[in-house]
Every structure is written in structure tokens, then in C-alpha cells.
């Protein structure tokens, strides 16, 4: 849902928006690893070399946010920024607390507690893109 809401015209030319959630490989990967499809999608991002330098945005998947932080620790991957605003009662607050506590130095945007969601994540990404566009900092 985040990928759908991003205003592509505000992004630098040739910017890719990658969402693996509909990737047919995900169910098998998730089952083999004993994780959620969204967490498995993070592994696909890493395998495809897409984490380093990327802006990672999540609005609904605390397990994916946890996995991004794990992959960063395990591999040294370094996104440019993380917009981590998962919503919900199970793991959402904890995943955002883990993001805040992360000592990698990667910039982040979050909303502490259980509130969040795709709309907030999209708004944050679009605001960053708009700001970069108006300051020529793309």
C-alpha cells in the first residue's frame, strides 16, 4: 500500500519503487524461514542488492521492520533512511522502539506506540521527496 501512494513525479528520475509482497516466491521463502511474507520480502531486497542507499518505508508490517534491523546487523547493509511506522497491537510499538534504539546511525522517521499505518508512511516519504525537490537535494 505504501508503494501505491508514493508520488512518483516527485522522485528523482530512474528511482525504483520496489514492493515484493506479490512476488510468487514469497510464500515458499516465508515458509522455509518460518517468518512472515513481509519479513521474507526484506531478504529479497537484500538478495537483490536493494537495501544499501535505499529509503525503506513500512506502514503495516512490524515483522518487516524487525527484519530490516536484523539484516542491517547481519550484513552491514545501510539504507539511506528508514520510514518505520507500522500500525497495530502485535509488535508495532516494539519494532519502532527497536528502530529508535538501533545504533547504526541510519536516519529514521517513526511514530512511537501502536499508531501508524501506510497513510502515515506514504505521507512521510512524499514529504521527504517534496522537500528534496524544493531544495534541489535529490
Q: Locations of the language-model features?
A:
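Solvent-exposed alpha-helices and their adjacent loops that cap or buttress functional pockets
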Residues: 9-11, 46-51, 73-77, 100-103, ...
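C-terminal functional extensions of proteins
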Residues: 90-138
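Short glycine/serine/threonine-rich phosphate/pyrophosphate-binding segments
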Residues: 2-5, 63-68, 89-93, 117-121
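Structural motif
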Residues: 15-18, 53-57, 79-83, 106-110, ...
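Feature captures the catalytic cores and cofactor-binding loops of soluble hydro-lyases/lyases
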Residues: 64-81, 93-94, 99-101
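Long, charge-dense
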Residues: 3-54
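Glycine-rich phosphate-binding loops that contact phosphosugars or nucleotide phosphates
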Residues: 38, 58-74, 90, 124
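Buried hydrophobic positions in well-ordered alpha/beta secondary-structure cores of metabolic enzymes
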Residues: 83-84, 124
Amino acid at each position: 500500500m505504501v508503494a501505491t501512494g508514493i508520488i512518483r513525479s516527485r522522485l528523482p528520475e530512474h528511482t525504483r519503487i520496489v514492493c515484493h509482497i506479490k512476488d510468487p516466491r514469497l510464500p515458499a521463502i516465508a515458509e522455509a524461514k518460518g517468518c512472515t511474507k513481509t519479513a521474507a520480502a526484506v531478504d529479497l531486497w537484500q538478495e537483490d542488492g536493494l537495501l544499501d542507499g535505499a529509503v525503506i518505508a513500512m506502514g503495516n508490517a512490524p515483522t518487516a521492520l524487525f527484519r530490516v534491523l536484523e539484516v542491517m546487523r547481519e550484513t552491514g547493509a545501510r539504507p539511506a533512511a528508514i520510514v518505520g511506522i507500522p500500525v497495530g497491537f502485535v509488535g508495532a510499538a516494539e519494532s519502532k522502539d527497536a528502530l529508535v534504539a538501533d545504533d547504526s546511525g541510519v536516519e529514521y522517521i517513526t511514530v512511537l506506540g501502536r499508531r501508524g499505518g501506510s497513510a502515515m508512511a506514504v505521507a512521510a516519504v512524499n514529504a521527504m521527496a517534496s522537500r528534496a525537490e524544493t531544495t534541489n537535494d535529490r
